[in-house]
Amino acid sequence: MNKIKLVLDKKGIKQKWLAEHLGKSFNMVNSYVQNRTQPSIETLYKIASILDVEVDELLYSKDDIEQSKNKQ
């Protein structure tokens, strides 16, 4: 499960905008957002770069990330 929708909503970015910048169709991006299809690792890194977030933020909740940091 990914958090793309949460990041898009938080940043006020539309799926159409992401699709255009990613070079994918709106339907494909919508599939990612709705968790019907998972993006490839390469695409996930591109999405993170476009949205200016860490890949971890697209995959895990903030609580998961904090717990992981505290264990290190």
Feature names for model-found ranges:
Residues 17, 28, 57:
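Residues in the helix-turn-helix
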Residues 24-38:
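Recognition helix of helix-turn-helix/homeodomain-like DNA-binding domains
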Residues 6, 12, 31, 59-72:
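Short, charged recognition helix plus adjacent turn
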Residues 1-5, 33-36, 56-59:
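Catalytic cores of transferase enzymes with a strong primary signal for eukaryotic protein kinases
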Residues 2-21:
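Short basic helix-loop element that most often maps to the first helix and adjoining turn
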Residues 42-57:
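DNA major-groove recognition helix of helix-turn-helix/homeodomain DNA-binding modules
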